[in-house]
């Protein structure tokens, strides 16, 4: 979905990795939450506290999923799922955007 309707958006951004990754929290009437983020070129490691679905909105990510040794490519319009309490890495060579839905 390219448009989110009837939501509240946090004014303050979530800033990571010296400003190279930034996201905003989006809250829905049913209590669910998503984050919309922008990632500058680089390689980053993240950890989850709950399950997530990461959708690539624009650009391309290479992802090293938990307990794997091979980077996988995810392009615009694709997604990957992560369990709670895991770490994963992403890398990209150009600006990319994502939408994270929490399970």
Swiss-Prot record:
EC numbers for this chain: 2.4.2.1, 2.4.2.2
Protein name: Pyrimidine/purine nucleoside phosphorylase
Enzyme class: transferase
Gene name linked to the record: ppnP
Gene3D superfamilies: Jelly Rolls
Organism annotation: Shewanella baltica (strain OS223)
Catalytic activity: a purine D-ribonucleoside + phosphate = a purine nucleobase + alpha-D-ribose 1-phosphate; adenosine + phosphate = alpha-D-ribose 1-phosphate + adenine; cytidine + phosphate = cytosine + alpha-D-ribose 1-phosphate; guanosine + phosphate = alpha-D-ribose 1-phosphate + guanine
Keywords, ordered alphabetically: Glycosyltransferase, Transferase
GO CC, alphabetical: cytosol
UniProt family annotation: Belongs to the nucleoside phosphorylase PpnP family.
PANTHER family named in the record: PYRIMIDINE/PURINE NUCLEOSIDE PHOSPHORYLASE, PYRIMIDINE_PURINE NUCLEOSIDE PHOSPHORYLASE
Pfam family, one: Ppnp
GO molecular function, one term: guanosine phosphorylase activity
Function: Catalyzes the phosphorolysis of diverse nucleosides, yielding D-ribose 1-phosphate and the respective free bases. Can use uridine, adenosine, guanosine, cytidine, thymidine, inosine and xanthosine as substrates. Also catalyzes the reverse reactions.
């Amino acid at each position: 979905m390219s448009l989110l309707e009837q939501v509240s958006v946090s004014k303050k951004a979530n800033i990571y990795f010296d400003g190279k990754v930034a996201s905003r929290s989006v809250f829905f009437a049913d209590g669910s939450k998503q984050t919309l983020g922008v990632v500058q070129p680089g390689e980053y490691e993240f950890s989850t506290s709950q399950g997530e679905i990461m959708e690539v909105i624009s650009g391309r990510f290479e992802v090293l999923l938990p307990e794997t040794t091979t980077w996988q490519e995810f392009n615009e319009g694709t997604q990957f799922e992560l369990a709670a309490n895991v770490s994963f890495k992403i890398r990209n060579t150009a600006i990319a955007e994502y939408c994270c839905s929490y399970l």
